[in-house]
């Protein structure tokens, strides 16, 4: 990824691991369970009066098959889309723009290639 910036957010990684945990089973779920948030940790942060704003959306390719348990756990955070369609990119950018109150716009400049 020469010449590209990469931003890694620990909070985002934690959120994604939690979402993946709900979609996993067996030894994968067991391994992921070591890294997901617990109510005990969340209560400690709340007690310190810390504010953090986060949005999580999971977009999956419309032709992929997803487990019902996974879909039930993440609910409205999940949407199937066509990543090569400009309307998908517009919808993702609009969601991010509204949530960040215009601070991040656009997030994506062009449709995503399925091979990337």
Curated annotation (Swiss-Prot):
SUPFAM superfamilies: Serpins. Belongs to the serpin family. Poxviruses subfamily. It comes from the Viruses. The lineage of its organism: Viruses, Varidnaviria, Bamfordvirae, Nucleocytoviricota, Pokkesviricetes. This is Putative serine proteinase inhibitor 2 homolog first part. Gene3D superfamilies: Antithrombin, subunit I, domain 2, Helix hairpin bin. It comes from Vaccinia virus (strain Copenhagen) (VACV). One of its GO terms (cellular component) is extracellular space. GO terms for molecular function: serine-type endopeptidase inhibitor activity. InterPro entries: Serpin_dom, Serpin_fam, Serpin_sf, Serpin_sf_1.
């Amino acid at each position: 990824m020469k010449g590209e910036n990469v931003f890694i957010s620990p909070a985002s990684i934690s959120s994604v691991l939690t979402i993946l945990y709900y979609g996993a089973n067996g030894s994968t779920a067991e391994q992921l369970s070591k890294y997901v948030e617990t109510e005990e940790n969340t209560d400690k942060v709340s007690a310190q009066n810390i504010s953090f704003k986060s949005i999580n959306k999971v977009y999956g390719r419309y032709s992929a098959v997803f487990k019902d348990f996974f879909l039930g756990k993440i609910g409205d955070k999940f949407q199937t889309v066509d990543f090569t369609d400009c309307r998908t990119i517009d919808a993702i950018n609009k969601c991010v723009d509204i949530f960040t109150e215009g601070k991040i716009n656009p997030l994506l400049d062009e449709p995503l290639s399925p091979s990337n």
